[in-house]
Regions:
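Non-catalytic structural scaffold of enzyme domains
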Residues: 1-211
Length: 211
């Protein structure tokens, strides 16, 4: 439920702040849609920048006039006011189709990034649509870029957008505005925490992130 998402997200933020985080990036479309307002109200008054992620709908719509754009996301993301407000901004410029993808996150978190089961799932998802008429697909969940190549196989030549790059740019901008941007020339350190805290899940996280 939305209430559970807000509660879990706040617990995650507190966990990271206890370990010295200077800013929070909510790298989850569902958590951003449901909880970002509450997070900003609570933590930005403590001088902690909170950056959310949004589906890359704007570049997908503006790439071609009167295009047909499919937004793949979790059912909860697509049902939230935040997403539908953004959709309303662009609905006169493109035919925007919401595609809920129940179960896709669970496939990815189970390590299923390719194979016949995933292939069949994606085929069923796109079955109701005339693929040749789709101009762009927006990946409205941060899990989905991990299976971008598999999605592309079902839609050869179709542009696929995700919000990761825009979120990275916004994070740099906010850190600069707040005087928190590191002046280090070298790269940072990556630490992975997982709520299940089991080695197989941590290993899967490293594999998914190419670490």
């Amino acid at each position: 439920t939305p209430e559970e998402v807000i509660d879990l997200t706040k617990k995650d933020v507190d966990f990271l702040l206890e370990r010295g985080a200077k800013a929070i990036v909510v790298a989850c479309n569902t958590a951003t849609s449901v909880a970002i307002r509450e997070l900003r109200e609570e933590y930005e008054k403590k001088d902690i920048p909170v950056i959310g992620i949004e589906p890359a709908l704007k570049p997908a719509v503006l790439a071609k006039e009167h295009s047909k754009v499919v937004v793949m996301a979790t059912p909860m993301t697509l049902s939230q006011t935040k997403f539908n407000s953004m959709l309303h901004v662009y609905e006169d410029e493109a035919n925007i189709i919401k595609m809920p993808c129940p179960g896709l996150v669970e496939y990815i978190e189970g390590g299923m990034l390719e194979g016949p089961v995933l292939d069949e799932y994606l085929e069923k998802q796109f079955e109701p649509y005339e693929k040749s008429e789709i101009d762009a697909v927006v990946l409205g969940c941060t899990h989905y870029p991990l299976v971008k190549n598999e999605i592309q196989k079902h839609l050869p030549g179709v542009a696929i957008y995700d919000g990761g790059f825009g979120t990275a740019k916004q994070t740099r901008k906010r850190l600069t505005e707040c005087g928190l941007l590191s002046g280090k020339e070298s790269g940072g350190e990556v630490k992975i925490f997982n709520s299940k805290n089991t080695e197989d899940v941590l290993e899967l996280s490293r594999r998914l992130l190419n670490l």
